């Protein structure tokens, strides 16, 4: 119910709408006025009733009755007005109560909304912690699995007594922890004999003797003696045979090896470029010795981190060896291994997997699934998988390598082999024990990556004993053990036994 009143002095300006408080105040004033008016009318009605009761029949009686009726109507109107005013006041009180309740509910809604925001934030934080916990649990389970795998490797460890009796490892210029099978059974004399034929031309006996001396001095770290020896021999060869002679190229290659073992990669690279030019001119661009020199150059470029320049050299060496030796020759597999390592350092993992798969098929076809070269190739491929975070594939390869059929019997187990197999079994046990050490390092890297730790890259050690082999690229006789290559640490570089960085 609303009441419109005209404000004083606002005639002709339209009605003014009162506020609820003003309306209630004026209504109460009206109620007071009506109550006073009702009291007056009750008094007036009483006087009229007394007058009518004491008045006899006369002309004034009719007028009194008429006045009494008017007063009665006024009283009814006053009572009606009072009733409406009371209803208006009650309605106003009810509206006020509703408004107060509305404000209270709004305040409660705001408080609940704020609490809802807090609860939502707490829920998000709880969900985040839950996800982190689930990831941590998954990581710990994976880590536990690989630690169990590392524990299984320990059953093949030699006893502590034999470990203590072994001579301490050399801290010289060896670049790899895994010498090839060929180098393990060759001494300097055997190496010199193997170098008697060098890509179809005869190496003089004096050059072979000099080569053996260089091996000896380089193995002792006496480079101040080895380098002048090489340079003097190189000058003598150039005076006697001229610069463009295969013997000069061989001597350049030997000197490059010495510089490489001193980490003088630039000088070694320059010498190998010279040797490559001589061999291409004297032996032809598709001679196995040219392929070996190309491979050696690729190795040196790889050691200097220039993988993009090394890759085409390695690819050309592969093409020459495929053409000359055949696509299934072990030297082709070695070259594929080097090419895979170069691609791996450039992040070309599809090419890496393809090259390793082909090398693996060559070694399996030549030596069967138990050939140590097969295990080493699988280890290289597993390392590539680790770099791609393909932990499952890497672990499967490691387990294949460590399968019981591929491993020698643990130390202390009964020996059922014949006496004639003892030397070969010993070499095989030594080689596979080194593979196990490489696998253990790979698994430790895997666990470290799961823990978010960066695997510390070991400082590369040079390899003077690689001077011990003058690689012969002619086809090998059936049954000859093919040279194996080395498995190295991250960051991965071309290993010494795959480098063919020899004086051919």
From Swiss-Prot:
<keyword id="KW-0493">Microtubule</keyword>
<dbReference type="GO" id="GO:0043005">
    <property type="term" value="C:neuron projection"/>
</dbReference>
<dbReference type="InterPro" id="IPR011990">
    <property type="entry name" value="TPR-like_helical_dom_sf"/>
</dbReference>
<dbReference type="GO" id="GO:0031514">
    <property type="term" value="C:motile cilium"/>
</dbReference>
<dbReference type="InterPro" id="IPR019734">
    <property type="entry name" value="TPR_rpt"/>
</dbReference>
<dbReference type="GO" id="GO:0035253">
    <property type="term" value="C:ciliary rootlet"/>
</dbReference>
<keyword id="KW-0677">Repeat</keyword>
<feature type="modified residue" description="Phosphoserine">
    <location>
        <position position="466"/>
    </location>
</feature>
<feature type="modified residue" description="Phosphoserine">
    <location>
        <position position="173"/>
    </location>
</feature>
<dbReference type="InterPro" id="IPR002151">
    <property type="entry name" value="Kinesin_light"/>
</dbReference>
<keyword id="KW-0221">Differentiation</keyword>
<keyword id="KW-0505">Motor protein</keyword>
<protein>
    <recommendedName>
        <fullName>Kinesin light chain 3</fullName>
    </recommendedName>
</protein>
<comment type="similarity">
    <text>Belongs to the kinesin light chain family.</text>
</comment>
<dbReference type="GO" id="GO:0007283">
    <property type="term" value="P:spermatogenesis"/>
</dbReference>
<feature type="repeat" description="TPR 2">
    <location>
        <begin position="249"/>
        <end position="282"/>
    </location>
</feature>
<keyword id="KW-0744">Spermatogenesis</keyword>
<feature type="region of interest" description="Disordered">
    <location>
        <begin position="153"/>
        <end position="197"/>
    </location>
</feature>
<dbReference type="GO" id="GO:0120317">
    <property type="term" value="P:sperm mitochondrial sheath assembly"/>
</dbReference>
<feature type="compositionally biased region" description="Polar residues">
    <location>
        <begin position="494"/>
        <end position="504"/>
    </location>
</feature>
<feature type="repeat" description="TPR 3">
    <location>
        <begin position="291"/>
        <end position="324"/>
    </location>
</feature>
<dbReference type="Pfam" id="PF13424">
    <property type="entry name" value="TPR_12"/>
</dbReference>
<keyword id="KW-0175">Coiled coil</keyword>
<feature type="coiled-coil region">
    <location>
        <begin position="90"/>
        <end position="150"/>
    </location>
</feature>
<feature type="region of interest" description="Disordered">
    <location>
        <begin position="411"/>
        <end position="438"/>
    </location>
</feature>
<dbReference type="GO" id="GO:0007286">
    <property type="term" value="P:spermatid development"/>
</dbReference>
<keyword id="KW-0206">Cytoskeleton</keyword>
<feature type="repeat" description="TPR 4">
    <location>
        <begin position="333"/>
        <end position="366"/>
    </location>
</feature>
<feature type="region of interest" description="Disordered">
    <location>
        <begin position="472"/>
        <end position="504"/>
    </location>
</feature>
<keyword id="KW-0597">Phosphoprotein</keyword>
<dbReference type="GO" id="GO:0007018">
    <property type="term" value="P:microtubule-based movement"/>
</dbReference>
<feature type="repeat" description="TPR 5">
    <location>
        <begin position="375"/>
        <end position="408"/>
    </location>
</feature>
<feature type="repeat" description="TPR 1">
    <location>
        <begin position="207"/>
        <end position="240"/>
    </location>
</feature>
<dbReference type="GO" id="GO:0005874">
    <property type="term" value="C:microtubule"/>
</dbReference>
<feature type="compositionally biased region" description="Low complexity">
    <location>
        <begin position="158"/>
        <end position="167"/>
    </location>
</feature>
<keyword id="KW-0963">Cytoplasm</keyword>
<feature type="modified residue" description="Phosphoserine">
    <location>
        <position position="502"/>
    </location>
</feature>
<comment type="subunit">
    <text>Oligomer composed of two heavy chains and two light chains. Associates with microtubulin in an ATP-dependent manner. Interacts with KIF5C. Interacts with ODF1. Interacts with LRGUK. Interacts with VDAC2.</text>
</comment>
<dbReference type="GO" id="GO:0008088">
    <property type="term" value="P:axo-dendritic transport"/>
</dbReference>
<keyword id="KW-0496">Mitochondrion</keyword>
<keyword id="KW-0802">TPR repeat</keyword>
<comment type="function">
    <text>Kinesin is a microtubule-associated force-producing protein that may play a role in organelle transport. Plays a role during spermiogenesis in the development of the sperm tail midpiece and in the normal function of spermatozoa. May play a role in the formation of the mitochondrial sheath formation in the developing spermatid midpiece.</text>
</comment>
